[in-house]
Amino acid sequence: MIRRKPMMNRFLQFCVLGATLMGLSSCSTVNDLITSNLPESHSGRPSIVVSLREQEAYLYRREYRTASSRISSGREGYRTPIGRFQVIRKDEDHRSSLYGDYVDDSGRVVRTNVDSRRDARPPHSHFVGTPMPYFLEFSPGYGLHQGYLPGVPASHGCIRMPYWKARQFYNAAHIGTPVVVKP
């Protein structure tokens, strides 16, 4: 059995921890763990900053970042608007009025992934909008909400977030919360 000095053991533990964190530093889970544990009780009003280039959203209270999230913004042809906005509506159980499915009276999906403006409604069916939970509308028809994250811009212009992050941003924001969307 090899006996090490206590100082050497601590040094080795520190090296292993450092190497592990360096290997994970690009993982969003590390960033999520670090920022999700920051107190949300910092005084000051919340604000939201979205970086389309980084595909990240940040929640601030004053100058303190209290949360961050991976996102999926608008794909080609459905770009997310850039500029300074503010939350104009909150809807915890929002559904899209444009995108969704045509469903028959028994609840069976007749036609999926439709644009209600362009796709003809099959007989004996009705439109059911795609769920967009924790919707924070910042410009007419555009908002942050829970949705699928394929790792690239893929939405119709909204900003999709994981469930737990969309909920965190939703609970922190209020009508009038500033939203800055940067290229």
Where are these regions (language model features)?
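Short Gly/aromatic-enriched secondary-structure transition segments
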Residues: R65-E76, D101-G107
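Exported/periplasmic cell-wall-interacting domains
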Residues: I82, D101-P183
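Post-signal peptide N-terminal segment of mature Sec-exported envelope proteins
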Residues: L33-E63
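Solvent-exposed coil/turn segments that connect beta secondary-structure elements
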Residues: R53-Q55, R62-R65, G74-E76, K90-D93, ...
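Bacterial Sec-type N-terminal signal peptides, specifically the leucine/valine-rich hydrophobic h-region
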Residues: L21-L24
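Bacterial N-terminal signal peptides that target proteins for export
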Residues: R4-C15
